[in-house]
Amino acid sequence: LDVATGAGHTAAYLAERGVAVTAADISEGMLEEARKLAVERGLDISTRQHAAESLPYADTSFRLVTCRVAAHHFASVEDFLREAFRVLHPGGLLLVIDGASPEGAPVAEKWLQGVEKLRDPSHGRFLRPSEWGQLVQEMGFKVLRSECFPFKQPDLEWYFRTAGTSEANRSEVRGMVAQAPAEARRVLGLAEEEGKTVWWWPRLTLLARRPEVAKSAAQT
């Protein structure tokens, strides 16, 4: 199950490797893009429209739940994780990839959250890696791997295009970049390169397993 599949790239990657995939998204428009991608690549991918926080599947329906670069939009990450645990078969895996907030850098975190909210008003919040670890364990998962990799934001115009940012919000972001605090510049590597504004996002990759026998937070 690929939750918040968007244009379906993760679902397609898995299907190309022989995995039976259900691609799910709250947006019918995104599901249509995922279907187009599947047709282009000759892949058999099922699609379902629903929110991440309420999965319309029976318990233990899947052996893998994935969610790539989407969880920061969710109304409740806790509900998503609780539902992911429920629909996973015991021993099943959860893979989450998403932007993250830097640890121990509250000024940089506030700047990053503010910039992202202006770029894309549907943004909720980037969690810190430690918050992710705590939440998945509270829901009953065992963390197998949790790593942050730097992802380069190559230029402001690219950043705006990917979200269709309004002109008014673009102007506000440029102002925040110009007045960025020293901690944000240092922690995020905010700089000018060949006339382009760049910085480095923390991107979390988290792999967790539903134990063979365990109680979830929803069952306690």
Would you name each region that the model predicts?
Residues 145-220:
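Conserved Class I S-adenosyl-L-methionine
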Residues 125-139:
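Short alpha-helix
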Residues 63:
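Conserved acidic residues
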Residues 95-118:
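Conserved class I S-adenosyl-L-methionine
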Residues 66:
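A conserved beta-strand element that flanks and buttresses the S-adenosyl-L-methionine
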Residues 1-3, 7-54:
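Class I SAM-dependent methyltransferase SAM/SAH-binding core
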